Curated annotation (Swiss-Prot):
Protein family: Belongs to the UPF0102 family.
Organism lineage: Bacteria, Bacillati, Actinomycetota, Actinomycetes, Mycobacteriales
This protein's name: UPF0102 protein Mvan_2202
Organism for this UniProt entry: Mycolicibacterium vanbaalenii (strain DSM 7251 / JCM 13017 / BCRC 16820 / KCTC 9966 / NRRL B-24157 / PYR-1) (Mycobacterium vanbaalenii)
One Pfam family this sequence matches: UPF0102
SUPFAM superfamilies in UniProt: Restriction endonuclease-like
Length: 121
């Protein structure tokens, strides 16, 4: 990072790093930045027969809190609603549904720090 990146550029970088991490775990990305009138889902992936809705949070500092503060109860409710809308539009059915959070900490470190919390909702 050069220090001149916009919030959008930092967010896009964090999301790409998260997708790379998830694919490295064997998840298959179905959609990125899926939008409807209620909001946006960052990443939708398949983990075997489970569909996973992933909220990606990118941080350059701890000023806004760490992983524990990344997703509030209000955000979880919104993610559940969005997941329901996406699922209602799908022709098939999934054996399981999961909501995960991936935080990416980038900044002065050479290697970004990725934290993956499975099943937050």
């Amino acid at each position: 990072m050069t220090g001149t990146e916009s919030r959008a550029e930092i967010g896009a970088l964090g999301e790409q790093l998260a997708v790379d991490y998830l694919q490295g775990l064997g998840l298959r990305v179905l959609a990125r930045n899926w939008r409807c009138r209620y909001g946006e889902l960052d990443v939708i992936a398949a983990d075997g027969r489970a569909v996973v809705f992933i909220e990606v949070k990118t941080r350059t500092t701890d000023r806004f809190g760490g992983v524990a503060q990344a997703v509030t109860p209000t955000k979880v409710r919104r993610l559940r609603r969005l997941a329901g809308v996406w699922l209602a539009q799908q022709p098939g059915h999934w054996a399981a549904v999961r909501i995960d959070v991936v935080t990416v900490r980038i900044g002065r470190r050479r290697v970004p720090e990725v934290t993956h919390i499975k099943g937050v909702a």
